Amino acid sequence: NFIPNNNAKHLKQSTSKNIAVLVKGTSNMLFANIVEEVQKMLEETKYSAEVCYMDEDKNEVEQALILCRERKPMGILFLGGNPSNFKEKYEQIEVPGVLITNCGKELPFENLSSVSVDDIAAAKQAMDYLLENKHTNIGILGGDITLSHTSQQRYLGCLESFKKHGLEFDKEKYYENCRFSFDSAYRAMVRLLEKAPDI
């Protein structure tokens, strides 16, 4: 009548060969491609990936703490993240971590590094291209800039470009929040076109 308990089994293991991959958002196509590449790379090593998807509005560091207690990973890859979540609780995590898509240089943790894009510069470059080609009524779909650091950085890059070109950006009219999924983006685009048909 013995029923194995997975949590007990993992607690009993002194070492794990798993690398936890925490993915914020279940429908982000960019993250899906990154996860696939990470899994391919790890197949060539002695490690395996333990992929954990979570809602994009949840706290990734709290989830990492749970994973560290229950699964004891060798390290954690964070796909998506909010720097304020790391500032609050990351010191409790002892394994190495890597932020992917977010910059970690302002976070004071020796066991945390990052591989990222300069979202401000990239968004500014994209917006510069549109404005230099005489597009001025430009709609932007993005995440909630109060919750998503990446969305906030991209929005700031767009604003910098508008300012550089001597233009104002009307956020109420031309910015629409959405989650990082095709369905949410479609619904946001419909809302945006209803309030700004001049796009």
Where are these regions (language model features)?
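Amphipathic helical "hinge" segments at domain boundaries
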Residues: 3-65, 72-75, 156-159
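Short hydrophobic/charged patches on amphipathic alpha-helices used for structural packing
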Residues: 8, 62-65, 87, 127, ...
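Residues that mark the start of a beta-strand
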Residues: 18, 135-137
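Periplasmic-binding protein-like
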Residues: 22, 72-80, 139-142, 175, ...
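Hinge/beta->alpha junction and helix N-cap segments in small-molecule ligand-binding domains
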Residues: 24-33, 51-59, 114-125, 141-163, ...
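Short helix-capping segments at alpha-helix termini
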Residues: 42-45, 164-169, 195-197
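Flexible loop/hinge segments that line or gate small-molecule binding clefts
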Residues: 78-124
